[in-house]
């Protein structure tokens, strides 16, 4: 960096295997302990292509690390309310506090744990996901999702807000529309927190769509 500018390290790579990256993160680019813990728990796998990343060692805000890359069959575990996923392909960009993913994946798996007991599996998935993370909460927004699964064609959107202070109530708003679908798959979209009575009523009331 030139005089008067903040020091910045720039990384550019055509191809990057994510599997061995997690153990090296702390030594290559030290981050706050809370962020490092999240990175370890995610246990990311897969491949990045066309990687662009900036590291500002003296920065104290979310711009300390910023990035953009094409994802190829990326997977990660659930942590801090964030979902688990497999076979994530698309374009990702962001920094330590916010980001977005433009998803275009085949054989896509998403698990909104612990809200839903089982992962959702789809033949094809296209979506826009945006997130923010700070010391108070993690927010994940999907303004549009279009997927193709065994149950039919699905359009959905959701907002999930998870508070770091567990004494505060978390929030979720999920809307799912099923076209040319099979009502047998209704239980797949029923949150685990529903009462047994309401869950049973929904299972039997929704037959097709």
PLM region spans:
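Extended amphipathic, helix-rich lipid-handling scaffolds
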Residues: 1-78, 90-98, 102-151, 171-209
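Active-site pocket-lining segments that scaffold enzyme catalytic pockets across diverse folds
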Residues: 87
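Polar/acidic, low-complexity leader/linker segments enriched in S/T/G and N/D
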Residues: 156-158
């Amino acid at each position: 960096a030139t005089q008067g500018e903040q020091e910045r390290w720039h990384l550019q790579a055509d191809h990057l295997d994510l599997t061995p990256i997690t153990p090296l993160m702390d030594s290559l680019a030290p981050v706050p302990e809370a962020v490092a813990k999240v990175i370890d728990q995610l246990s990311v796998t897969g491949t990045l292509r066309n990687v662009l990343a900036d590291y500002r060692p003296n920065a104290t805000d979310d711009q300390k690390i910023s990035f953009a890359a094409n994802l190829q069959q990326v997977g990660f575990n659930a942590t801090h309310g964030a979902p688990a996923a497999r076979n994530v392909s698309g374009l990702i960009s962001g920094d330590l506090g916010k980001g977005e993913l433009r998803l275009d994946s085949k054989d896509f798996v998403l698990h909104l744990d612990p809200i839903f007991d089982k992962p959702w599996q789809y033949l094809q998935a296209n979506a826009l996901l945006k997130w923010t993370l700070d010391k108070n909460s993690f927010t994940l927004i999907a303004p549009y999702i279009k997927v193709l699964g065994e149950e039919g064609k699905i359009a959905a959107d959701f907002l999930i807000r998870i508070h770091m202070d567990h004494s505060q109530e978390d929030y979720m708003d999920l809307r799912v529309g099923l076209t040319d679908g099979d009502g047998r798959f209704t239980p797949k979209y029923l949150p685990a927190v529903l009462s047994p009575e309401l869950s049973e009523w929904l299972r039997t009331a929704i037959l097709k769509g």
